[in-house]
Amino acid sequence: MSKKIVTLAGDGIGPEIMSAGLSVLKAVSKKIDFEYELEAKDFGGIAIDKHGHPLPEETLQAVKNADAILLAAIGHPKYNNAKVRPEQGLLALRKELGLYANVRPLKIYPALKKLSPIRNVENVDFLVIRELTGGIYFGQHELADDKARDVNDYSADEIRRILHFAFKSAQSRPRKLLTSVDKQNVLATSKLWRKMADEIADEYPDVRLEHQLVDSCAMLLITNPQQFDVIVTENLFGDILSDEASSLAGSLGVMPSSSHGFNGLALYEPIHGSAPDIAGKGIANPVSMILSIAMMLRESFGQEDGAAMIEKAVTQTFTDGILTKDLGGTATTKEMTEAILKNCQ
């Protein structure tokens, strides 16, 4: 049965890397007999220009009826002081789809080790899972001249939902290790978080659960990143730790992500921005988009062979020394994509 994939190319380099990613999806799908149909919709800045809103109703209805969503990039400096901004569309999309679990995989490729800001990056391969719908970002906010207050609020249901997602993610990986990150020595929300993690762990006897305080975890991501397999944490901590972890890769151009909703629908996107300064020049790194498509094949459609094929092709392309400018090479978007296509075996 054919799967429906809605594509949101967005702004800046978005259309270029989306095109590159879809060419890889097309080639790999033929090899694994995966059938799909694409529906392209306006989103972000281009949607503001054409429809007056970053998330038009037509786009919203399309994504709600999709089996998966691919987003390339949104944003442009011209909207920085505008009343309506592209980023508002992404926040609205997350809310409408109930996207509660953000997943960022970090893998250090041997050929790219020299790009990492730290030396000790051998065999680094882990996930950071961040809760997206609760916590201090969504609590009550008060600001006065001499006082301010932000409320960190989590329900048991919100914590339970993300922890089950994380345990299942750890269960699917060879090491089966889950590190739950909190600040339970200070925060009430973290005390509840840790209590629930220990209780839920009984349902996953094959997964080893460890606890880390957030400050300790931040240090260990630099001093011993190999110890991690799957990290799960609340919204604010996850925002900070996932960005810290991403820096280990040396370039955002190789970092994919996924965000999963209540009903199983997921959004896949690179973690980098729209890079308007290089848009249209044909030099954007398409790898994060291509790897996001690999995540889609695995997480939404169970196509492990297709996902592994893409990931191995990317690894081989790096090993062959074909690198875009952000990785220290000279390859164009087209050349990088063609090399990955060639290595899809």
Swiss-Prot record:
SUPFAM superfamilies: Isocitrate/Isopropylmalate dehydrogenase-like (SSF53659). Mg(2+) binds at D215, D239, D243. The record marks Y137, K183 as: Important for catalysis. Keywords: Amino-acid biosynthesis, Branched-chain amino acid biosynthesis, Cytoplasm, Leucine biosynthesis, Magnesium, Manganese, Metal-binding, NAD, Oxidoreductase. One of its GO terms (biological process) is L-leucine biosynthetic process. The keyword GTP-binding does not apply. Its cofactor is Mg(2+); Mn(2+). It comes from the Bacteria. Its EC number is 1.1.1.85. Changing A308T: In strain: IL1403. NAD(+) binds at G273, S274, A275, P276, D277, I278, A279, G280, K281, G282, I283, A284, N285. One of its GO terms (molecular function) is 3-isopropylmalate dehydrogenase activity. It catalyses: (2R,3S)-3-isopropylmalate + NAD(+) = 4-methyl-2-oxopentanoate + CO2 + NADH. Substrate binds at R94, R104, R130, D215. It is found in: Cytoplasm. Pfam families: Iso_dh (PF00180). Catalyzes the oxidation of 3-carboxy-2-hydroxy-4-methylpentanoate (3-isopropylmalate) to 3-carboxy-4-methyl-2-oxopentanoate. The product decarboxylates to 4-methyl-2 oxopentanoate. Belongs to the isocitrate and isopropylmalate dehydrogenases family. LeuB type 1 subfamily. HAMAP family: LeuB_type1 (MF_01033). PANTHER family: 3-ISOPROPYLMALATE DEHYDROGENASE. Homodimer. This is 3-isopropylmalate dehydrogenase.
